[in-house]
């Protein structure tokens, strides 16, 4: 919760104080205040919880994680809107119509993972209608090749291709082993060992704004 609030606040400050080489870019950026916050290390998260990426139980864990992720990002942006004002282009977003991610996700997911929402979305919807959001978009999931190296995490929302991978860097090839290999190696599902790509198809669309 607090990490997501910190990420939203920190990136909001960057939008305000960074230098813009083109005036049009500054006007558009500050009017939309678009963020692209995602998470890395999903495979490690599942392994720590004793769930294999290819297991259907993983879908439930991802659902729970993603609901919290989206809820607290929106709540943090809403809180900033109350403090500092909503973004200028808020009225151009789906949020201004009271539409939230829980309304727009692909309903086919309910056939493979149907669980009750845990957070107070009705409260959040009303608060967003009343006060708006500080940002027009908040989340985006990316491969995170570089950031996963810095934090020694698995790539974004992807399963690892191997326990040991070799990645390119400016200083040459860099070897990286999956987090907690010694204790969690039996909990990881490697990409090439997955019986099908169903989990990738159902997991990948979930964490989007």
Predicted region positions:
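A short, hydrophobic C-terminal helix/tail in secreted or cell-surface proteins
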Residues: 205-209
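Long, C-terminal-biased catalytic regions of enzyme "large/alpha" subunits
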Residues: 3-204
């Amino acid at each position: 919760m607090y990490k997501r609030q910190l990420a939203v606040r920190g990136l909001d400050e960057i939008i305000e104080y960074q230098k813009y080489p083109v005036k049009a870019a500054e006007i558009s950026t500050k009017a939309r205040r678009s963020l692209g916050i995602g998470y890395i290390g999903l495979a490690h998260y599942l392994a720590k919880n004793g769930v294999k990426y290819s297991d259907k139980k993983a879908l439930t864990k991802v659902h729970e994680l993603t609901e919290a992720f989206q809820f607290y990002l929106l709540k943090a942006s809403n809180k900033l809107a109350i403090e500092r004002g909503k973004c200028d282009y808020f009225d151009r977003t789906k949020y201004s119509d009271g539409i939230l991610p829980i309304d727009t996700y692909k309903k086919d997911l309910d056939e493979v993972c149907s669980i009750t929402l845990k957070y107070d979305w009705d409260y959040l919807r009303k608060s967003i209608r009343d006060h708006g959001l500080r940002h027009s978009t908040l989340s985006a999931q990316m491969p995170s090749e570089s950031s996963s190296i810095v934090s020694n995490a698995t790539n974004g929302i992807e399963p690892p291709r191997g326990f040991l991978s070799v990645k390119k860097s400016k200083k040459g090839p860099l070897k990286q082993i999956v987090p907690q290999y010694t204790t969690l190696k039996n909990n990881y599902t490697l990409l090439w060992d997955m019986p099908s790509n169903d989990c990738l198809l159902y997991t990948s669309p979930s964490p989007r704004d």
